[in-house]
Regions:
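PLP-dependent class I/II
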Residues: 1-185
Length: 185
């Protein structure tokens, strides 16, 4: 909901369909929007009965995060949000570059998104052109020959795709594309 750049405002399920309000639980965290990866702070909002049941399960399955992480998360959520807007602008610029560059690589087809810091191109044609079995083999090839780490789409139930992060500098992305072109063609 924070890393989003479409012209239309973000709409939650409960806003889109008020009849679902009493059955909707929204789960989020601070890792992505506030660059607090590893702090492991999440939160949920929803009907009191569901949240109460979630608290019972959570209290028996995990321990609490440290108080420093909790205080930092509260400060992030309640503080000035301009850093999130600036980060989102940077992500959008990197997204636009990466999607365009990936679509110039033979056998890669990547759709534009409205907010994320991952690209998820369909690489089925590249897999076939390289004589590979699947996205796992392509990921292995890219790691070995291009020294580019990607996550096979099959890890997300999407065989024939790969996931690349663009939570890095534009220079790093340009080098990534150069290496991908060298290996793929």
């Amino acid at each position: 909901e924070h890393i989003y750049w479409a012209p239309e405002p973000f709409v939650s399920f409960a806003e889109a369909c008020p009849a679902l309000y009493d059955r909707t639980v929204t789960i989020n965290g601070v890792s992505k929007a506030y660059a607090m990866t590893g702090w492991r702070i999440g939160y949920a909002g929803g009907p009191k009965t569901i949240i109460a049941a979630m608290k019972k399960i959570q209290s028996q399955s995990t321990s609490n995060p440290c108080s420093i992480s909790q205080a930092a998360s509260v400060a992030a959520l309640n503080g000035d949000q301009s850093c999130v807007r600036e980060m989102t602008k940077a992500f959008r610029a990197r997204h636009d570059y990466l999607v365009a560059a990936l679509n110039e690589i033979p056998g890669f087809r990547c759709l534009r998104s409205a907010g994320t810091f991952y690209a998820f191109p369909n690489v089925s044609e590249a897999i076939q052109a390289k004589g590979l079995k699947d996205d796992l083999e392509l990921a292995s090839l890219l790691l070995k020959e291009a020294e580019v780490a990607v996550v096979p789409g099959s890890a997300f139930g999407a065989a024939g795709y790969i996931r690349l992060s663009f939570a890095c500098s534009l220079d790093t992305l340009k080098e990534t594309i150069r290496r991908l072109r060298r290996v793929i063609g």
